[in-house]
Design a protein with these regions (language model features):
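Class II aminoacyl-tRNA synthetase catalytic cores and aaRS-like
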Residues: 1-601
Length: 601
């Protein structure tokens, strides 16, 4: 209560304060029949007794007529609540404040919605009146937890490990492959700044500058259009170090998270387990596995290799063909026929992948189209390798390895959702399973032209030391020194050891990616002037906090988020500007026809 005229907050009064005269400020949350009201501030609630005697009639009138959510000041004496009227659900439930004087500091007009966590509001309405939504205890708690976590991260990095907090520019230039960058016009005709997707180049240049250890709570920008649960501006904990290897960065992040982790969420165990990209794809069908539950993908190619099933033999005749399956525990008991059909339909529509099912009946017999093609030996081997129990359901896919694994990985998650919706506890919502995923490919074929390559992450990632020679002979086979941090099936961080050789960086840009290296001449020149080996990582702060507090959306951990279409519904941004305002930037708007007509009308 330093620097302010209140004596206490609304959440701190206890029995020990009985008899004290206090001054409270807050919002009127509730008022009952002219007898008492509940005053709320950032810390909690206090029950205020409205005086009934003639001497305080003006106080009674003022407090009885104050609309809900009005801001008031109340001075009074702390008293114990009468026997039987204590409220164990409130931290201040043993006391009440008997009002002696009061003042309405600001009256509130009719609210667009009630400020109570249990009352459902449309998200659009919450976003439009975000300053009201922020009064809810849930958002208050989320933002304060976020603030505390960032403070402990600063303490760990700067005070304990010598990192330097540096602000990097947000006005820069477009980078190769930076198609998702926001452009900012300049007064030089035809020239634009770009808002960086991350401080990547600047943090590398800080290492060239000898800063050794850099850290920033960085604002980043990405123009991705309409994407649910993505924000056009977001925050990352950005880190770079000189003279470090992959293991060093990983140990740093494990220590950072352990130090800053909120006490009320339990402790996290380190070191985090690690898995290669290939292992993650083969066992979970994704590079961000949720390891809180089993149902791993199992390779059954060898079991069925000798069978005369046409689609099996057809799949295995291809170089990367495989037969894989997942076993859904108690699937027969918890999933309906409609559920199974929806799973197969998802595989078909999303991955163009057919699925076969095997249902293990309670008597041990199978219900499947495959039964007539399989001998007892193959059935026994499948039962063993898939660990099939009665009432389990197996989903089986045959085809190209990556496609089969990706489809089964998606069905694994969909099945888990269906099982939990039907009442089977599968994933512990209070558990936090961290995982490092390593050894990603350095390059991937472009979706629009598979004969050309693009960076799997970004063009500054160094090749794996074991694969360095392959960079010049067969870049498609090169693994990278990139590492992702995954939490409960969500990517919460990503980083890499960087290329610190100008020659190698130029080769990657020009020969492998077919990009104009001149655009990055400032970085390549810096690498020629004594760049140390270096690497780093960025943690997605919004995503991390949303997982810690189990928020349904990252919008619930950001003070003023954009809608999923990238709009600010409160301030109505983005907005139109006049031709006169555009003139200094040498820009004219070319209106789509329908908008032209709308503006005319």
């Amino acid at each position: 209560n330093s620097f302010v005229t209140r004596t206490n907050t609304c959440g701190e009064l206890r029995s020990a304060h009985v008899g004290q005269k206090v001054t409270l400020y807050g919002w009127v949350q509730y008022q009952r029949q002219g007898l008492f009201l509940v005053l709320r501030d950032f810390q909690g609630l206090t029950q205020v007794i409205i005086p009934q005697d003639e001497a305080h009639s003006h106080v009674k009138e003022l407090l009885c007529t104050a609309p809900l959510e009005s801001v008031v000041r109340v001075t009074g004496t702390v008293s114990p609540r009468p026997p039987g009227q204590q409220n164990p659900k409130m931290p201040t439930g043993d006391i009440e404040v008997k009002a002696e004087t009061a003042e309405i500091l600001n009256s509130c007009k009719k609210l667009p919605f009630e400020i109570k966590d249990f009352i459902k509001k449309s998200e659009a309405l919450r976003m439009q009146f975000r300053y009201l939504d922020l009064r809810s205890s849930r958002l208050q708690s989320n933002l304060r937890l976020r603030s505390g976590l960032v403070m402990r991260m600063r303490e760990y990095l700067c005070n304990l490990h010598g990192f330097v907090d540096v602000e990097t520019p947000t006005l820069f230039k477009r980078t190769p492959g930076g198609a998702k960058e926001f452009l900012v016009p300049s007064r030089e005709a035809g020239k634009f700044y770009s808002l960086p997707q991350s401080p990547q180049q600047f943090k590398q240049l800080l290492m060239v500058g000898g800063l050794d250890r850099y850290f920033q709570v960085a604002r980043c920008y990405r123009d991705e259009g309409s994407r649910p649960d993505r924000q056009p501006e977001f925050t990352q904990i950005d880190i770079e170090m000189s003279f470090v290897d992959q293991a060093g960065i990983q140990r740093l992040i494990e220590g950072l998270l352990q130090h800053s982790w909120p006490e009320e969420r339990g402790s996290i165990m380190t070191p985090f387990p690690s898995m290669t990209y290939e292992e993650a794809l083969a066992e979970y069908g994704t590079d961000k596995p949720d390891t809180r539950f089993g149902m791993k993908i199992v390779d059954i190619s060898d079991v069925l290799r000798g069978s005369n099933i046409h689609f099996v033999q057809n799949a295995l005749s291809y170089p990367h063909g495989s037969i894989r399956a997942i076993c859904i525990p108690q699937g027969m008991r918890y999933l309906t026929n409609k559920d199974l059909e929806s799973l197969k339909e998802s595989a078909k529509s999303q991955f163009n992948q057919e699925m076969m099912e095997i249902i293990c009946r309670p008597d041990g017999s199978w219900k499947s189209l495959l039964t007539k093609f399989l001998g007892e030996k193959e059935k026994s081997e499948l039962t063993q390798v898939l660990n099939m129990q009665e009432d389990d359901v197996v989903l089986l896919a045959a085809g190209e390895h990556k496609q089969v694994c990706s489809a089964l990985g998606a069905l694994r998650l969909l099945s888990a959702n269906l099982l939990e919706a039907a009442g089977l506890a599968l994933r512990d919502p209070t558990a936090f399973h961290f995982l490092w995923v390593v050894d990603f490919p350095l390059f991937l074929p472009k979706a629009e032209n598979p004969t050309e390559l693009e960076s799997a992450h970004h063009p500054f990632t160094a090749p794996h030391p074991s694969d360095a020679s392959l960079l010049y002979s067969d870049p498609t086979k090169v693994r990278s020194q990139h590492y992702d941090l995954v939490l409960n099936g969500n990517e919460v961080g990503g980083g890499s050891i960087r290329i610190h050789s100008a020659e190698q960086q130029r080769f990657v840009l020009e020969k492998v990616l077919k990009e104009d290296s001149e655009v990055l001449s400032h970085l390549i020149e810096a690498l020629e002037l004594g760049a140390p080996p270096h690497g780093g990582i960025a943690l997605g702060l919004d995503r991390l906090i949303s997982l810690i507090v189990d928020a349904p959306s990252i919008r619930d951990v950001i003070a003023f988020p954009k809608s999923f279409r990238g709009r600010d519904l409160m301030g109505n941004a983005p907005d139109y500007v006049t031709p006169e305002e555009l003139e200094p930037y040498h820009i004219q708007v070319s209106w789509p026809l329908e908008e032209k007509e709308a503006k005319k009308n």
